[in-house]
């Protein structure tokens, strides 16, 4: 057994995702002696943290065994580290990824991969022509609840799928009295902000894999909270949408619906719930729990529900049990991509899949502007 080391550049390391997900999970892999490979070797990631604030970077690095750090992307690209992870603001991502490709780095980035589908596909083609391996984070289907939902779909539990419904969001404070839970760039178009651009990336791969590929979209969006306060306590005008509602046509004939808002107070099991209805049964899943109702367990609710206390609609739902411990979804993404690099194991969410996610957001924006249904065309290199 040999130890193999692989340098990973994390750009945006001091941000929430960079610190709590990417850095934390890569350090956990290293702390456990590395990622075991098929030949018995262990792959140990070594980090190079990149950000704009030297003070924050220095403190972060010192708090985690004195990791290497720099405020210069040029310096990072000149280093021998082989992988570039970008989890900084979306707006300037294409430029940074192009620099990384020119430096010969393998690309593994957060979604959305670019502000527009044309830019996203350009990155995919550029990385492919350079002979580099590339991928995008798709973490949600590794969450326990959605993993169970995917297993049900793959097992044929639903029979013919009729519909899929996504209900997601929560109240994001405006920063006046309580700190905003999302960075201010999320609300600025020029910096890659917008709820649809951010979250359609998830809904695309989730619905494609849970139910059927999306072939049409019709959307409606709004800006519910027009003014917010940024990280420095300064008010700013919001020019990006914070609500997104969409109807979808799926390839298998099913219908999809997305209700997504950063200005809602949820009364449901989770901030993010996906329900699939089929001829043989239904299932509803949040991030951590999943419930099913088979055709045989379906109550007669149409008339009974009209009477007070007539029927308990929650009673016929059964929770899907856990089958074992679950790893952090981002760690599972990293392990899969590191194996892709080290031993050519498959990694399906390439930059083309990332572009498909941006495509759905692009078409949703066009649907709003043109007030009509948009066809979702196939994307290929």
What are the roles of these predicted feature ranges?
Residues 1-64:
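N-terminal Rossmann-like dinucleotide-binding module
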Residues 38-39, 68-79:
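Short acidic low-complexity segments
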Residues 81-83, 89, 94-141, 156:
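Beta-strand-loop-alpha-helix segment that lines the small-molecule cofactor/substrate pocket
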Residues 88-89, 260:
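Short glycine-/small-residue-rich Rossmann-like dinucleotide-binding loops
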Residues 140-238, 371:
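Predominantly a Rossmann-like dinucleotide-binding segment in NAD(P)-dependent oxidoreductases
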Residues 159-163, 366-381:
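C-terminal capping/lid region of NAD(P)-dependent oxidoreductase domains
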Residues 198, 209-216, 221-224, 229, ...:
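Glycine-rich, aromatic-lined ligand/substrate-binding cores of catalytic
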Residues 229-231, 236-237, 245, 249-250, ...:
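C-terminal glycine/acidic-rich active-site capping loop/insertion
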């Amino acid at each position: 057994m040999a130890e193999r080391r692989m340098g990973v550049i994390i750009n945006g390391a001091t941000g929430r995702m960079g610190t709590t997900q990417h850095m934390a999970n890569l350090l956990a892999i290293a702390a456990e002696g590395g990622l075991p490979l098929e030949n018995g070797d262990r792959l140990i990631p070594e980090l190079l943290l990149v950000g704009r604030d030297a003070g924050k970077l220095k403190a972060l690095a010192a708090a985690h065994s004195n990791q290497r750090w720099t405020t210069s992307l040029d310096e990072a690209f000149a280093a021998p580290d082989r992988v570039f992870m970008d989890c900084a603001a979306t707006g300037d991502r294409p430029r940074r990824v192009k620099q990384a490709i020119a430096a010969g780095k393998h690309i593994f980035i957060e979604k959305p991969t670019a502000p527009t589908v044309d830019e996203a596909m350009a990155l995919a083609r550029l990385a492919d022509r350079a002979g580099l391996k590339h991928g995008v984070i798709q973490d949600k289907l590794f969450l326990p609840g959605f993993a169970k939902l995917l297993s049900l779909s793959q097992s044929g539990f639903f029979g013919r799928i009729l519909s899929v419904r996504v209900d997601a969001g929560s109240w994001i404070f405006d920063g006046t009295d309580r700190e905003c839970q999302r960075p201010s760039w999320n609300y600025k178009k020029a910096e890659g902000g917008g709820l649809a651009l951010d979250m359609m990336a998830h809904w695309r791969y989730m619905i494609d894999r849970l139910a059927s590929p999306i072939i049409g979209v019709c959307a409606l969006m709004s800006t519910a909270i027009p003014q917010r306060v940024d990280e420095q306590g300064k008010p700013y005008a919001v020019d990006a949408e914070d609500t997104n509602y969409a109807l979808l046509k799926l390839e298998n004939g099913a219908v999809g619906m997305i209700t997504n808002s950063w200005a809602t107070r949820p009364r449901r099991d989770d901030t993010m719930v996906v329900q699939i209805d089929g001829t043989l049964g239904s299932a509803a899943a949040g991030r951590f729990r999943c419930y099913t109702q088979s055709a045989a367990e379906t109550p007669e609710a149409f008339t009974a529900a009209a009477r007070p206390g007539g029927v308990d609609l929650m009673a016929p739902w059964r929770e899907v049990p856990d089958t074992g411990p679950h790893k952090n979804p981002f760690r599972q993404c990293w392990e899969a991509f590191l194996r892709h690099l080290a031993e050519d194991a498959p990694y399906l969410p390439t930059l083309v899949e990332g572009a498909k996610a941006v495509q759905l957001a692009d078409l949703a924006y066009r649907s709003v502007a043109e007030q009509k249904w948009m066809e979702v065309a196939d994307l290929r290199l």
